[in-house]
C-alpha cells in the first residue's frame, strides 16, 4: 500500500525509497507516566504526575512559569532520575536508563534555547542526529574504507530528505548560525527527527516567533505527526498554538496536575482559569 504525508495542506505519496519509518500503529500508548515525581531537598518539583499519550497524539503540557513543565521533560529524558513513580516508553520501563539510552529507545527533544552547532553546516547538524544509525567501525572511519563511504552516502541522503520535508534542502551548505531564527528552530526539530523518535518533545517551540512563523510552526507540527506517525508533546505559552493543534492538554501548577482534557474542557476549567489562563486574560484586559 502506498504511503502518504502532509504537504501544503494536501496528502501526497511518499517515495518508495523514503526514510520515513514503518511503525507499529497499535493501540498501545507511546508513553505512560504513573505517580511520577522528583524531590529536591524538601521541595517537590513534580508530584504524583500521571499521563498517557497515544501513539500519534499531539499533546500539550501547560502551566504558569515554575509549574514544573521543563522538569517533567527532564524526567522523561533522564536528565533527572525520578525519586518516585515509573515511566513506560513503548511499553518498556525506563528506570535506570541514561539520556543516551532514552534517545535510542525513542524520545527526541528540543530545548527552550536553541542548541545548534552554529559553525557547522545545516546538513552536518542533521547528520549529528543520525549518529545512532552509524554502523561502521572506528577503523573504517579512520582509514576511509568502503563501509565508511557507504554510510556517509546514506547519511547524506537521509539528511537531505529530512531537510526537503521542511523545504530547507537549499540551505544544506549554509552555516547553522547564519540562519534566521525561525529556520534555526526548524533545523533543531529536523535534527531531533533524525534520531527516528516515536515521541518528540518540544520545549517552547514558538518562543521568539512572530505570528506568521507560529502559524507555520503549527502546520509543521501537524506535518511531523502525519508524516512520521509519531507522538508529539509540547510545552508552550502560546495558547492559540496549544488550543489549535493539541488533542489532549495537561495542566501543571506547583508540580501537580490540576487538569487534563481537550482544549474546550481546559478553557472551561475553573482551576485552570485561575492558575494559568486567567492570568493571561487579565494581562490582555
For each of these PLM feature ranges, what is it?
Residues 2-285:
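Glycine-rich phosphate-binding loops of nucleotide-dependent enzymes
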Amino acid at each position: 500500500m502506498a504511503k502518504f504525508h502532509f504537504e501544503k495542506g494536501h496528502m501526497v505519496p511518499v517515495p518508495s525509497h523514503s526514510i520515513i519509518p514503518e511503525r507499529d500503529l497499535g493501540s498501545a500508548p507511546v508513553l505512560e507516566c504513573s505517580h511520577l515525581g522528583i524531590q529536591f531537598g524538601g521541595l517537590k518539583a513534580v508530584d504524583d504526575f500521571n499521563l498517557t499519550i497515544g501513539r500519534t497524539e499531539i499533546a500539550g503540557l501547560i502551566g504558569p512559569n515554575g509549574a514544573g513543565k521543563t522538569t517533567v521533560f527532564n524526567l522523561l529524558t533522564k536528565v533527572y532520575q525520578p525519586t518516585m513513580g515509573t515511566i513506560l516508553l513503548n511499553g518498556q520501563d525506563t528506570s535506570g536508563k541514561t539520556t543516551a539510552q532514552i534517545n535510542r529507545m525513542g524520545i527526541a527533544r528540543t530545548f527552550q534555547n536553541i542548541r545548534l552547532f552554529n559553525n557547522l553546516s545545516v546538513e552536518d547538524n542533521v547528520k549529528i542526529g543520525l549518529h545512532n544509525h552509524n554502523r561502521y567501525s572506528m577503523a573504517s572511519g579512520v582509514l576511509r574504507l568502503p563501509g565508511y563511504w557507504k554510510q556517509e552516502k546514506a547519511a547524506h541522503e537521509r539528511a537531505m530528505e529530512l531537510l526537503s520535508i521542511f523545504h530547507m534542502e537549499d540551505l544544506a551548505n549554509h552555516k547553522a548560525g547564519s540562519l534566521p531564527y525561525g529556520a534555526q528552530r526548524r533545523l533543531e526539530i529536523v535534527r531531533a527527527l533524525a534520531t527516528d523518535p516515536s515521541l518528540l518533545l518540544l520545549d517552547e517551540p514558538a518562543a521568539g516567533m512572530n505570528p506568521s512563523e507560529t502559524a507555520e510552526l503549527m502546520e509543521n507540527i501537524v506535518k511531523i505527526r502525519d508524516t512520521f506517525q509519531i507522538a508529539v508533546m509540547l510545552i508552550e505559552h502560546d495558547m492559540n498554538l496549544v488550543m489549535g493543534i493539541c488533542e489532549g492538554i495537561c495542566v501543571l501548577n506547583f508540580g501537580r496536575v490540576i487538569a487534563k482534557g481537550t482544549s474546550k474542557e481546559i478553557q472551561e476549567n475553573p482551576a485552570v482559569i485561575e492558575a494559568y489562563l486567567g492570568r493571561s486574560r487579565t494581562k490582555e484586559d
